[in-house]
C-alpha cells in the first residue's frame, strides 16, 4: 500500500488583506475544504499561508476560493497570490489556524481600520443627505408649480363654462 503524503506550500497573498477579516475567512474556507495549515500577517503587508494539499486540484480550488473573497467582501482587495512548494512536509493540526504575534497590537490596528471605515461611511451619509435635501427642495417646487397649474386650469375651466352658458 502506497501512502501519498500531502505537499506543503507557502501562499503569499498581496493586496489589502490585513485587518479586514481576511484571515477569518481563510480559516473558514480551509475548514470547509479540509485543508490543514497556518495563516498569519507578515510585516510586508502580505498574508502568508502554510498549508498541506493532497493534490494540485485541492490547491487550485483553495486559491480560487481565496480569489472569490474579493467579490464577496468589499474590504478585501487581492492583487496577486504567489505560491512556493516547500521541500519539506510540515504536519499541522486539523484546519487552518491563525498565528498572531501581538494580539493587542492586532486589535489596535483593527480598531484604527474600523474607525477609518466609519469615517468613510459618515462622509457618504453626508453626501446622501445633501442629495436627499436637493430632491426634497425639487419636490416642494414641483408641488408649488402643480398647484399653480391646477389653479390656472380651474380658471380656464370656469371661463369655458361661462362661455358655454352664454352660448
Curated annotation (Swiss-Prot):
Residues 8-106 form the Acylphosphatase-like domain. InterPro entries: Acylphosphatase, Acylphosphatase-like_dom, Acylphosphatase-like_dom_sf, Acylphosphatase_CS. GO terms for molecular function: acylphosphatase activity. PANTHER family: ACYLPHOSPHATASE (PTHR47268:SF4). This is Acylphosphatase-like protein MJ0809. The lineage of its organism: Archaea, Methanobacteriati, Methanobacteriota, Methanomada group, Methanococci.
